[in-house]
């Protein structure tokens, strides 16, 4: 894993502990046929759904489109809302909005905070997916895709 992103993440934890910020993030299930795209960050061990933080003055849709364009060079077509989830890990009140996109393109570009991008067959997912990401994938596979609310 690259050192600088890991250091930034490590130094952010005391800040989060003191200030207990409320944060808003976005993630997306990028599904193509029987595969799903996952990313591995340079500063974390697990595979994740792609996404990131929402900037001030930015819509949720604009945020997910920007994040995946910056991180993995993806251009998104139509989006559907899958759910809104809350996470209180690392001293934050983090709220994550999850979208579904089955119409996307990749241009091969990858941000320096991304170590790896991979399309996995949904039936053959790796064991080291983040717990929140695997829960979202499992929910997607077993429901009618109406939006849900819950814990990350």
Question: Where would I find each of the regions flagged by the language model?
Answer:
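Residues embedded in well-ordered beta-strands
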Residues: 27-29, 35-37, 96-100
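Conserved Nudix-box catalytic region and its N-terminal flanking loop in Nudix hydrolases
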Residues: 31-70
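Unchanged
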Residues: 54-77, 86-140, 148-151
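Acidic, metal-coordinating catalytic segment for phosphate/diphosphate chemistry
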Residues: 1-27
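Short secondary-structure boundary/capping segments
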Residues: 20, 28, 39, 89, ...
């Amino acid at each position: 894993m690259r050192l600088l992103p890991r250091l930034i993440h490590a130094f952010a934890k005391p800040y989060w502990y003191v200030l207990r910020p409320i944060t808003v993030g976005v993630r997306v299930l990028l599904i193509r046929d029987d595969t799903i795209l996952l990313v591995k960050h340079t500063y974390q061990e697990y595979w994740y759904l792609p996404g990131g933080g929402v900037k001030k003055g930015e819509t949720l849709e604009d945020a997910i489109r920007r994040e995946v364009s910056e991180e993995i060079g993806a251009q998104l077509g139509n989006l559907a809302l899958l759910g809104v989830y809350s996470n209180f890990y690392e001293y934050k009140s983090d709220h994550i909005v999850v979208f579904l996109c089955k119409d996307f393109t990749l241009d091969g570009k990858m941000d320096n905070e991304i170590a790896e991008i991979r399309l996995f067959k949904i039936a053959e997912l790796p064991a080291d997916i983040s717990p929140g990401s695997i829960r979202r994938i499992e929910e997607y596979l077993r429901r009618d895709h109406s939006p849900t609310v819950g814990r990350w």
